[in-house]
């Protein structure tokens, strides 16, 4: 009986140590990406269909492409709310995202140059960022006259 009394605390300690090592903290990854390219907007009534295609690079996925599509509501001025989905694809992986509520493109008085701000929730990631979670902060510009856009993406992802 005495041996059993000593064995129980030792077993309990072993279980606690193995459980603690299995519960490691998520790894934090600072993500920065810069992309530029062409965007098209097709207006039908107050609905704007948006397509964006560009090139650039992002942390851990490398050089590659941005592809996104969505819709906006041009009846709300000067800041047009929009939403959609897209991908950031590089040699070392792909990030799939969807736009969170609150994204907008705010135009100048003539509706030519827009400042774009959005938060993009990662829905899936592959390659070096497989299983990464987080939200990308997107800040950029869009020129409606020539279709050009530039966007900087930043985030602290967890994996």
Predicted regions and their residues:
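Bacterial N-terminal signal peptides
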Residues: 8-16
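Beta-strand-enriched cores of mature, soluble protein domains
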Residues: 23-159
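Positively charged n-region of N-terminal signal peptides that target proteins for export
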Residues: 1-6
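C-terminal juxtamembrane segment of a hydrophobic transmembrane alpha-helix
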Residues: 18-21
